[in-house]
Swiss-Prot record:
Primary location recorded for the protein, binned into one broad class: cytoplasm
EC number(s) on file: 2.7.2.11
Catalytic activity: L-glutamate + ATP = L-glutamyl 5-phosphate + ADP
Protein name: Glutamate 5-kinase
Native organism: Yersinia pestis
One family name in Pfam for this protein: AA_kinase
Pathway note: Amino-acid biosynthesis; L-proline biosynthesis; L-glutamate 5-semialdehyde from L-glutamate: step 1/2
TM annotation in the entry: none
Length: 367
């Protein structure tokens, strides 16, 4: 749909519990209603949810457990299914399906796993399914630490090629000082660059049930803005906050990115040294240069070098002239097998498929 946006909404434990010891279901119902409203308008919504540990603690009757990683993992293992069941139940009221994605930092730092996660995310969004993301706290170890889901939401926004990231919290945004302790604290409305002064304003506050504070939200905002994604930190209790963010209505603190996600990605492609190269026929040259099309396996004549899926490669014509640089959807061995074949034959030849193109147009810079 023309004009549709992709919005990642991160809900911290303080928002989901309302500062209490249990999930605030009435508040979650309202947030789902807002998300469903925007989904119906054609926008793509991604949820990054905290609250698994809080849900587990509530379900087990608030047991007295030692403050250890194992205790957190126990509570997360119990609470994760309860939490996803709640999201599924509430979105189903509006006829919306959800898809659960449990991630760890390793899934996002390894290139192959990152691409697989991105493909899953895109498949869900393309089919109008709302991805609900949480860290896999039941198996992660070092990842259960301050700010992890804040940082995870920034990485999820990159995975989704999001237009905006909304970090919902129990504060109206970023202040010049802690408003709970300083009555003269002022809300910062617009941020065009994150520096040490701003980091000092964020402090290191952490809520009792969650693992994040304003400082980690600032870290997440920095990561997302560098990837070309605008970020808003706002109160989860703000009426109509999700619509306001999508519509561009001033709310909370807005962090402006310096470029679009596509511009950021293409700048990275331009600067990355090619890991290999492929030669394409005249039909592929015409499709790329004149039609702005993706490169299909059918147009590949030869493959040079050994490279992995997700690496940048050089694309040349039959005379050896550089045409473009792009990110390969398949590794070099796979492309050698696919060269000259139709896209419909990919699964038959390889036994798997990452899509019909060898290099997508959005992952390509023409020389």
């Amino acid at each position: 749909m023309s004009g549709s946006q992709t919005l990642v909404v991160k809900l911290g434990t303080s928002v989901l519990t309302g500062g209490s010891r249990r999930l605030n279901r009435a508040h979650i119902v309202e947030l789902v209603r807002q998300c469903a409203q925007q989904h119906a308008k054609g926008h793509r919504i991604v949820i990054v949810t905290s609250g698994a540990i809080a849900a587990g603690r509530e379900h087990l009757g608030y047991p007295e457990l030692p403050a250890t990683i194992a205790s957190k993992q126990l509570l997360a293992a119990v609470g994760q299914s309860r939490l996803i069941q709640l999201w599924e139940q509430l979105f189903s009221i509006y006829g919306i399906h959800i898809g659960q994605m449990l991630l760890t930092r390793a899934d996002l730092e390894d290139r192959e796993r990152f691409l697989n996660a991105r493909d899953t995310m895109n498949a869900l969004l393309d089919n109008r399914i709302v991805p609900v993301i949480n860290e896999n706290d039941a198996v992660a170890t070092a990842e259960i630490k301050v700010g992890d889901n804040d940082n995870l939401s920034a990485l999820a926004a990159i995975l989704a090629s999001a237009d905006k990231l909304l970090l919902l919290t129990d504060q109206a945004g970023l202040y010049t000082a802690d408003p709970r302790n300083n009555p003269e604290a002022e809300l910062i409305r617009e941020v065009h660059g994150i520096d040490d002064v701003l980091r000092g304003m964020a402090g290191d506050s952490v809520s009792g049930l969650g693992t994040g504070g304003m400082a980690t939200k600032l870290q997440a905002a920095d990561v997302a803005c560098r990837a070309g994604i605008d970020v808003v930190i706002a109160a989860g209790s703000q009426v109509g906050v999700i619509a306001d963010v999508i519509d561009g209505t001033p709310v909370g603190t807005r962090f402006h990115s310096l470029e679009t996600p596509l511009e950021n990605r293409k700048r990275w492609i331009f600067g990355a040294p090619p890991a290999g190269e492929i030669t394409v026929d005249d039909g592929a040259v015409f499709a790329i240069m004149e039609r702005g099309s993706s490169l299909l396996p059918k147009g590949i004549r030869s493959v040079k070098g050994d490279f992995s899926r997700g690496e940048v490669i050089r694309i040349r014509n039959l005379n050896g002239r550089d045409l473009a640089h792009g990110v390969s959807r398949y590794n070099s061995d796979a492309l050698r097998m696919l060269a000259g074949h139709h896209s419909q034959q990919i699964s038959e030849i390889l036994g798997y498929e990452y899509g019909p193109v060898a290099v997508h147009r959005d992952d390509m810079i023409v020389s």
